[in-house]
From Swiss-Prot:
The name this protein goes by in its record: DNA-directed RNA polymerase subunit beta'
Keywords, alphabetical: DNA-directed RNA polymerase, Magnesium, Metal-binding, Nucleotidyltransferase, Transcription, Transferase, Zinc
UniProt-listed InterPro entries: DNA-dir_RpoC_beta_prime, DNA-dir_RpoC_beta_prime_bact, RNA_pol_asu, RNA_pol_N, RNA_pol_Rpb1_1, RNA_pol_Rpb1_3, RNA_pol_Rpb1_3_sf, RNA_pol_Rpb1_4
Gene Ontology BP, a term: DNA-templated transcription
EC class (word): transferase
Complexes and interactors: The RNAP catalytic core consists of 2 alpha, 1 beta, 1 beta' and 1 omega subunit. When a sigma factor is associated with the core the holoenzyme is formed, which can initiate transcription.
Record keyword Nucleus present: no
Chain residues that bind Mg(2+): D746, D748, D750
HAMAP family: RNApol_bact_RpoC
Amino acid sequence: MKDFSKVRIAIASPAKIREWSFGEVEKPETINYRTLKPEREGLFDERIFGPIKDYECACGKYKRQRYEGKVCERCGVEVTSSKVRRYRMGHIDLATPAAHIWYVKDTPSKIGTLLDLSAAQLEKVLYFSSFLVTDPRNAQKDGRPLRRGELLSDDEYRELRFGRQETYTLPSGTEAAVRDGEYVTRGQVLGGNVVSKMDGLAQYRFPRRAEIAYAEEAEASLPLPSDVLVQQDSFRPGEILAELEGDVQITAPVDGTAFLLDMGEDSVLVELRDSAAEDAAQGEVLARVYIPHGMNVQVAEGEVVEAGSVLATAAAGDRLRVSRDSRLSNVNFPKKKGDVKVTAHWTRRVEYRIEPQMHVLVGDGSEVRKGQKVVGAIDKEEEVIAEADGVITLHAPASIIVSKARVYAYQDEPLVVNGDRVEPGDELADSGNLRSEISGRVEIDLVRKQVRVIESYDFEAKMGAEAVKELLDDLDLDQLEAELSEQMKDNSRHKRAKARKRLEVVRAFKRSGNHPSWMILETVPVMPPDLRPMVQVDGGRFATSDLNDLYRRLINRNNRLKKLIGQGAPDMIIRNEKRMLQEAVDALIDNGRRGSPVTNPGSDRSLRSLTDLLGGKQGRFRQNLLGKRVDYSGRSVIVVGPQLKLHQCGVPKRMALELFKPFLFKVLEEKGEVTNIKQARKMLERYRDTRDSVWDALEEVIEDKVVLLNRAPTLHRLGIQAFEPVLVEGQSIQLHPLVCEAFNADFDGDQMAIHVPLSAQAQAEARIQMLSAHNLLSPANGEPNVKPSRDIILGIFTLTQLRKDNLGAGSEFANEQDALKALDEGRVALNTPIRVNGVETSPGRLKYVFSSPDEAIMAVDRGEIDYQDHVRIRLNGTVYETSAGRVMFRRLVQEALGAQGHLVDTLVNLDTAYEKDSLKDMVMACYKELGIEATAGLLDALKDSGFKLSTISGITIGIDDIVLPPNKRELLAEADEKLAAIEQNYEFGFMTDEERYKQVVQLWNDTTDEVKNAVFENFSRNYPFNPLWIMSQSGARGNPQQIRQLAGMRGLMARPDGSTIEVPIRASFREGLTVLEYFISTHGARKGGADTALRTADSGYLTRKLVDVAHEVVVRDVDCGTTDYTVMPLGTTDERTGEWRTRKGSEIETAIYGRTLTADVELSDGRVIPAGQMLSLEDVKAITRDAKAIGEVFVRTPLNCRVRAGVCQKCYGYDLSQAKPVSLGEAVGVVAAESIGEPGTQLTMRTFHTGGVAGGGDITMGLPRVIELFEARKPKTQAVVADRDGVVRIEEEEERYLVRIEAEDEAFSSKTPMKISKSLRLIVRDGDHVEAGQPLTRGAINPHDLLLYKDTDAAQRYLVEEVQRVYRSQGVKVHDKHIEVIVRQMLRYVEITDGGDTDLLEGQTVERWEVDQANDALPEGKTPASWKPVLLGITKSSLTTKSWLSAASFQHTTHVLTEASMRGQVDELIGLKENVILGKLIPAGTGLTTVREMQVADERTLEKYGQTSVSTDAVTGSQRYDDTRPSSTSINPSYGD
């Protein structure tokens, strides 16, 4: 026994992983190819994991056990057993944290749930495609504060961290549509068809042209005519100077060369320079004349003019005004009218082309000073120097940069440098007068004297598991719990559901003591090397476990990352390497869970990761923990052993020699045949030379032993039984023919396994509990499973059959003499039924009257009569009309019963021909009346006699034994006539094709039945002793369908889809099939083969699921004390006719046999069966007889039991395999699962097609229906059910019915009608009264609807009845209680509708007892939790179980282990599977604590200890010896010796 009672699973912290480890694995090397020794610091390092050779260090300095525990100073290896390499672990320290993929990819993701991230978001962070904000500080995004835990794309991160700027290239020669330094908005055109994608500051890059607008001014004269009056002293651009009344000319005041200065529009300033100068353009200015807009210039540039020459003209009515690009000031009016002096101001624009090697030194719109360098260049001559003060404008930039920035022009020194980060209000320049308005990064343009602050923020955001770990590290679970509890009060159901999921995870972490950050690995444990071995194969190559490849990949990447970090590699490379490390960790833990799996080089086989080692049929749980290979076992072909007793099996000598070797050694040593084990081993080495003394010793060894025989598949507990071994020659195991049915074995090459229970306790348990003779009744239905069959039935039936002659049948005679005379004359035969003096008899009974059975048997031996002839025999003073064979059979049974032979008449009826069922009833009667020993003896006697009789009867089949009925031809001709009529009606359009098809199928079904009846009538009337007929009638072999096909007609066949082919096979096998008929047959045959294969797999899986859901249900208490009961109706009343219909006897039996009554039942004979009594078969038969008067009985069922994870004896009732109250510790859950699953293969796969009838739908039947019910699935064709009690009101529309249910109280009537399609057939009429949950249409009811609209009881009864309907349709008998045990497990969970003041959350699914426990624990005045029942399918129910070990070994191993470790779940080891996995005794049967604590004592011991009284427990039948001492001793016969 292991000394622990609970097992807890939790997440390992990095510290715990290092604590497990014996050293760090730093290198990916495994073993040296030359020395074949492990490499240091590698995956097989002896310093870390221990020595390869027992008690020997790596260098060989220390050898032998005397140095145990010493660490070699040369090689560093500890001297110890090499077994340590199976459990010593290592570790790998990761260069960067990596997430555990189970907590990432589980649904819902545990890490994602805690951090409120979706699975996709979490994946983006972990695999380096998004940043996770770990510290937002004052960062803003889209005008709101950045949140912690928010995701940022690469671009978003760069924009927020370093500022966003985008460069837009303009096509060559395109003029910009915005100014340099202008703020632009998203969507604004920048130039050509280039549009800005963001708001921000636009800045030119590489302008191709620059234009400087120089501000010019000069004094000039404005000669106007005397009649023009100028009254202002200044004129603005565009202002009117004068309106002319007559023509005007302006003339040159002096001689000179004219130079024209453009002042915009057509206004000019004419400079007259000295013509005598060498270069007139450089000559002295003699005069300047201002010519306003509106005058026509009459002089050309560089023209020499004389004083008085016309410079410009204007016509009368013209307006003179100042040009728009100039203005006039200091207008002086002379005394003499006409010549006005003015100062003219104008802008002179000069354009400069900027080549690529040149660069602008000032910004667009900047003012320039005369002599200032405006454009720099490599070549000094290309530089642009300002000719005068002016303003520069830049044109045609190569590109425009738009950035989120603010530009500040400064005068004084800046107070910041490039790259500095500033916050709002920080000083930038001008002694603190210039301050930043935003957060950002500083860029200083010293040339333009600008400080540019690019909007960005100093915040923390990271990628990968490192970022996630930081958030998990900082999680405040208490605060988060408070926030989520608040969210649970939200009105939104969706928000509450989301909060509940998160709150469950938060509370799980709080209660378990796990820290959320442990879901991120800093250290990876390395499995012990002997669990991931590397072995040398032929050819010098190595075969290695996939894990080594995965570890090697991880170590390589880890080392490479460490190296790159040490070298200061670029961020991009390191990021990629970190992602690859995360993927390597993922592949090690669960290969293929994300992305494509890592495969073997050169093949498509994906490597088996740690997860693959656990899950699936070949995983650790199912392969190694639940199913272990055992020693002391053998396997061989089985052959029949007709000479064996029921409790015996034949074991080949050679096999026994090997199986019992240790015991044999001991006996040989005791006998002095050998002196030591070595000698004994040598003695047994050569089988052929084995001495007789060894065989004698072997006989002695096996004398009091039993062995277990097992045939796969073990579908129920009778698949393993104990037998006493008998040594036989040959190499085959011999099996008793009668146990074949339990094993489902036959002798066509079946093999069986044999096991030896080793300890005395195991031997005792096997002998008492598992001996074949002690398992005569089936646990599924309580009927004998060991019963005569095949040849045995044939022999006994032949013996006890009565011959019937037809010669002179029905003749009447006045007296016996006349009858005997007629016999002598041959008018009647010996066994002809005749009447003598009005009494029915036969000539044989008149002629042969024997005074004793011996006399009759002697007459048979003399050949006077046959065993089957009618005779009269005196027996115990009474004369019986019977046959010699029946008397002979009575004697056989009497001899078999031995000492109890006087009770033979309670078993044998001389009026019966013993066929299959009557023999079964006889075995059952013997079991009940005389017990196990007598029944086993009787069965052996029947076997011996049956085989002998069937042999000497000489019954065999020849082709002539298949007799065709004489009227078959007439029946077929009649059918053809009807067929012609149907076809004619169809041709005339009186019916649809569907109706024709249905009628044709029905016609041939009826005809086939008629032919079958004709076959049977022909056999029974004319050939009563026909071998084929005898075999069929006795139940030995062949059913009516097979006889029909042999001698009648094959009939209709099925298509592969299950529908019927309307062309029948008219021939029988005796006549032979035509080619077409043979072809049609092949359809059905193939479908049968395919169905069987599918059924076997589905049935096995169903059994596995059933065992899983119910394995913990064990009888744990005598009486749970419940007052609940279940009403079992014994019949139904037809609603329309009011007629009572009693249920079939077999149905009543499977419903109430072995149940505890909760109310008295009064029988018509005045007998009362009291409440509290368990119903025996006799009680059930009596109740069935009075079913109509009784109506219904009230019984306890497992559905009402209050015992947690089990049932009590009273609620369960009888153990059907013992026909007595169930024992404490009986694993009734497993028995239930096996009882339902074992016959699963017999169920059909068929979905009955209704031949395409509209609205008929497909009715799922057989195995798929059973699976559908146990999985609580929505049926394919679902019935609409009433949602309340009331009266049905139906309105008909074109395509549907509107159904409303009116309740008695108007307030409860349905407001909106149910819309029912006309394709669903209504089964209620307008005005019918219905109850909630009653179906309104054809189809199967959805059990969830029953639970919703009615109650738990209705759902339970429906599930039980529907499963039974399928089993009964196939003739399989299963007791209701087995189905109830499973249904109870499906309904053990509830959904919380309001948590009240408990810790339970709305929407949570928990076991019912948990809610009761939580509510009971509340102090007074607090609100208890409320709930509603939920129906879970068996798969869901198995996975929801409290036992994580059981759930993980069932399905979805990773999900179960993820959940359990997060919750720090404790397995209380209540069920069977958990204990099998841990190698503990299962808590059932003899392993149950209460049973193990019982002490078995004999009378003498009791007297010695002074016991005073003996009392018998009414329920268990166990005797208790009560005493004043606290440790009373009790005996339970079920487990005693």
